[in-house]
Regions:
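Extracytosolic (periplasmic/ER-lumenal) interhelical loops and adjacent juxtamembrane/interface segments
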Residues: 81-107, 289
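Small-polar-interrupted transmembrane alpha-helices in polytopic inner-membrane proteins
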Residues: 59-78, 118-184, 221-229, 284-294
Length: 330
């Protein structure tokens, strides 16, 4: 079953598939197996890369970095940065243009390189998870939406938060990267939910909600609420983004309520019964690590000069759009 009609990755082999051993045998096999070697993981990675069309990989990883590099070498693009001295995004045509274009220009080569590398890191995990979840087309639509909407919304939020504090120009692709971080949270859970569905299809007697385990994609909202609670509650280290304990507490309550509702409706998320092969397990571990590092690096531990308000907008929009699809899928 797919979320949007495009093909999913072929099912990975699982312990006990078709051999009649039952779930207890699966658990013993899982416990007895040895960790994969680096060579085995490398072979699995290369096989996964070769299984995807080269044109599709190029479309995912090359056009946006090429655009950012091209903009950086064009003469006169320094004027594309957003001045925080303006009164609003709609003040003039020039302001509206710079509100959009500022997300595609950078202040230094290091700034550009940092955002390109972050983009590749995020998509290196988000793309294979999208294949597993059946979200290849949804990733394309989300990318187009992020490029069109996030720059304007992040510019508006930046002007509201910092417009009266400084007149320094704002620039950088980190708001859109933060949107991909939000997407990654949604697709991480969606991919695990797809794994759960395939496991249930193989063993109808071990339906979701039994001791076989499984993950519901809607648990992603708990992670987002919890991460926003930490972002607003923890000291950021910069004066222009002080802790807001009341806001953090509201998000913490929202996370707790969402967790309670989901626990009552679908049970807690459990990975034990899905039967992932080691290489697939590694993908989810890396994805979770990228999410954790991304939230800390863009929303919690904020370097001076980093536009955390743009990051927040990108993260929330980036999660909300695909999560709306999860809700629509039922």
């Amino acid at each position: 079953m797919t979320a949007d009609g495009d093909g999913t990755e072929p099912d990975a082999p699982r312990a006990g598939d078709g051999d009649g051993r039952g779930p207890n045998a699966d658990e013993r096999a899982s416990a007895d197996r040895t960790p994969p070697t680096l060579s085995e993981l490398s072979s699995a990675f290369l096989a996964a890369v070769r299984s995807r069309p080269l044109a599709e990989l190029a479309l995912v990883f090359l056009p946006l970095p090429a655009l950012l590099v091209a903009v950086s070498v064009l003469p006169g693009t320094e004027s594309w940065r957003l001045s925080l001295a303006v009164d609003g995004v709609l003040e003039s045509r020039v302001t509206l243009w710079t509100a959009f274009s500022s997300s595609f220009v950078h202040t230094t080569p290091d700034h550009l390189l940092d955002n390109v590398l972050n983009y590749w890191l995020l998509l290196a995990v988000a793309y294979p998870l999208s294949v597993i979840a059946g979200w290849r087309r949804r990733l394309l639509y989300a990318t187009l939406a992020y490029l069109a909407v996030v720059p304007l919304l992040s510019a508006w939020a930046t002007l509201v938060a910092l417009g009266g504090v400084t007149d320094a120009p704002a620039a950088g692709f980190s708001d859109v990267n933060s949107a991909f971080l939000g997407y990654l949270v949604a697709v991480w859970f969606a991919a695990l939910a797809a794994e759960t569905e395939r496991t249930d299809d193989r063993a109808p007697g071990l339906a979701a909600g039994s001791d076989s385990g499984g993950v519901d994609a809607r648990w992603a909202v708990v992670v987002v609420f919890a991460s926003l609670a930490v972002a607003y509650g923890a000291p950021s280290g910069v004066g222009y983004f002080p802790p807001l304990p009341a806001v953090g507490a509201l998000f913490a309550v929202a996370a707790a309520v969402a967790a309670g509702v989901l626990y009552a409706a679908v049970g807690r998320p459990r990975l034990s019964g899905i039967g992932l092969v080691p290489a697939r397990e590694l993908l989810y571990v890396v994805g979770a690590s990228v999410i954790l590092a991304g939230v800390i690096g863009s929303l919690v531990v904020v370097p001076f000069g980093s536009n955390v308000f743009a990051h927040l907008v990108g993260y929330v929009v980036g999660f909300t759009l695909p999560f709306a699809g999860v809700i629509a899928d039922g």
